[in-house]
Amino acid sequence: QRFFQAVLTDGQPIVAAVKLSQQGQFNLNEMEDKWNKFTATQLVTTQRLGFDWDARIQMTPGLNAFVHDTYLLGEGSLHASLLGLFTVAKLQGAPENNQGELLRFLAEATWYPTALLPSQGVHWEAIDDTCARATLTDGATTVSLIFQCNAEGAIATCRAEARYRDKVAAMPWCGRVWEYSVRNGMLIPLEGEVGWEY
């Protein structure tokens, strides 16, 4: 309740679609900090849950990896290629992939916070004064995240007990957002980071 009062205005229209531009750094290496610059555009729909993320990750000067990550009609899909020609990863439709992509949608909903309203299918369960568990079901997939709010009532962190990195191992996954600013009448974070806990 406190979160919605902090980030939404009275009468805030429900966000139906969003287009985002992103830039940042991406670490593809599990063993060491090896950060690569990326740029991306992302389209999100909230009435039929989904997103389409198109990213370009600079591996070395002149060598880019292209990553297309989607959640559409209840199915997660990831395709990564070098130079847009050579496929290096392809995942589609496995329950583990669907779970991971729906978790991503739920975590990123801080950018389109009306999607977190109970009227939009999110079930909230208070844990304490600053934390609550949000659960979202889409078709056969159900996911939960624990969100923690800052002193102002806006979301500061989220955490999933288990998100699949691949079809074998699920590990704790967490995110942090900050630098809140008003956009289209909503208070949303402009910066964030996510990753698996080792």
Question: Where are the predicted features?
Answer:
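Short hydrophobic alpha-helical segments that form membrane-spanning helices or hydrophobic packing faces
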Residues: Q1-V7, L190-V194
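N-terminal mature ectodomain segment of secretory-pathway/periplasmic proteins
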Residues: Q5-F86
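Short, exposed beta-strand/loop patches in secreted or surface proteins that constitute
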Residues: G11, T41-T46, D69-Y71, G121-I127, ...
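Short, hydrophobic/aromatic-rich segments at coil-to-beta transitions
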Residues: I14-S21, T46-D54, I127-T135, A156-T157, ...
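Short, solvent-exposed secondary-structure boundary motifs
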Residues: F26-F38, W53-G62, A107-S119, A134-A140, ...
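A short, polar/proline- and glycine-enriched secondary-structure boundary/capping micro-motif
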Residues: P61-H68, T87-Q92, S144-I146, D166-M171
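Flexible, processing/modification-adjacent segments and terminal tails
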Residues: H79-D138, V168
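Gly/Pro-enriched, hydrophobic low-complexity segments
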Residues: R133-Y198
